[in-house]
């Protein structure tokens, strides 16, 4: 049993690592696309439209024996709630935040997500809580606050507001990871994505329709590199990355999956600086150290005293 479980865990880890590489480029490509070629809500709508149509079409070709259990109304409602939090709400907040802050800041703030997962587990699932977890959560939040209030170099419109939006998006995503985990065990991943993406599409449609229709991306001739970057965002970052993240929950826990986000500030910053989208700043590594220190404290295990009876 253990030997078969290990390869499956490795598959889960590889899936999440793949999404980290995709997201490192995706955030930077979205920064290039916005707002010159398309506004934030318009980009979110296009992503959710591609996702919804894509997964509904794919689901039609899944054999009945591969679909596992048939979702009940309550299951569909919970999966759609997951879509509202983890796709629609998360993307609306994150992409609007990214539009007015730097990509490196976005990567650093996203690293607070494992801490949020633990904090929510304490609040919702009544997980164990101690002073180390309390100090760790405070340190993680301090790191997020530090990167948000420090001055920024480069063309950043309203970094603080953007950083706050990205933080709230991380809360939405953490809630989604906790909520959707049981449904990845019960139903085929494509079926789960089908209902989640439909809910996300319904949520973002009224926000993004006007922006999508008037976007220069579609009303004027866009350069080849812009079209390729859009293709990357829509196919790799929207369809494939979301599917891999969901599929990985079959093999690893939401907590383990969220830990991989600590790689993002490194891989993402390399891409950001290479593309000239943000200059290197010492504020970001300092904030990252605070967040990682908080994470380490949260995971500090209590020492168990062993009492030896000599009688």
Regions found by a protein language model. Name each.
Residues 1-46, 155-182, 202-206, 309-311:
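Glycine-/small-residue-enriched transmembrane alpha-helix faces in small-molecule transporters
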Residues 10-15, 41-61, 81, 136-142, ...:
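Hydrophobic alpha-helical transmembrane segments of multi-pass integral membrane proteins
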Residues 22, 27, 56-104, 109, ...:
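Specific transmembrane alpha-helical segments of multi-pass solute transporters/efflux pumps
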Residues 24, 56, 83-88, 92, ...:
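Hydrophobic/small/kink-forming positions within alpha-helical transmembrane segments
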Residues 29-40, 67, 99, 148-159, ...:
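Membrane-interface helix termini and inter-helical loops of multi-pass transporters
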Residues 33, 43, 47, 97, ...:
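Hydrophobic/aromatic residues within transmembrane alpha-helices
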Residues 46, 87, 91, 105-112, ...:
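Helix-helix packing/entry segments at the starts of transmembrane helices
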Residues 55, 120, 129-151, 204, ...:
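Hydrophobic transmembrane alpha-helices of multi-pass small-molecule transport proteins
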């Amino acid at each position: 049993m253990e030997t078969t479980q290990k390869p499956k865990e490795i598959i889960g880890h590889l899936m999440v690592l793949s999404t980290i590489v995709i997201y490192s480029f995706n955030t930077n490509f979205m920064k290039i696309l916005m707002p010159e070629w398309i506004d934030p809500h318009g980009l979110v709508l296009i992503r959710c439209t591609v996702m919804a149509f894509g997964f509904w079409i794919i689901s039609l070709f899944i054999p009945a024996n591969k679909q596992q259990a048939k979702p009940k109304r309550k299951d569909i409602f919970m999966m759609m709630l997951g879509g509202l939090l983890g796709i629609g709400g998360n993307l609306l907040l994150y992409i609007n935040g990214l539009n007015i802050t730097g990509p490196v800041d976005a990567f650093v703030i996203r690293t607070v997500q494992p801490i949020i997962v633990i904090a929510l587990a304490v609040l919702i699932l009544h997980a164990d809580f101690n002073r180390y977890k309390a100090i760790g959560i405070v340190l993680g939040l301090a790191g997020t606050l530090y990167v948000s209030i420090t001055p920024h170099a480069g063309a950043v419109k309203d970094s603080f507001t953007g950083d706050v939006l990205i933080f709230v998006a991380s809360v939405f995503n953490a809630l989604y990871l906790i909520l959707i985990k049981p449904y990845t065990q019960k139903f085929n991943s494509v079926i789960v994505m089908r209902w989640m993406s439909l809910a996300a599409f319904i949520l973002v449609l009224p926000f993004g329709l006007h922006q999508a229709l008037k976007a220069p991306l579609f009303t004027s001739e866009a350069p080849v590199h812009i079209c390729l970057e859009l293709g990357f965002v829509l196919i790799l970052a929207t369809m494939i990355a979301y599917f891999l993240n969901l599929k990985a929950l079959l093999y690893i826990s939401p907590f383990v999956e969220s830990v991989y986000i600590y790689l993002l500030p490194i891989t993402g910053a390399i891409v950001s600086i290479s593309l000239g989208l943000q200059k290197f700043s010492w504020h970001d590594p300092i904030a990252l150290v605070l967040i990682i220190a908080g994470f380490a404290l949260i995971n500090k295990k209590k020492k168990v005293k062993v009492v030896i009876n000599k009688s």
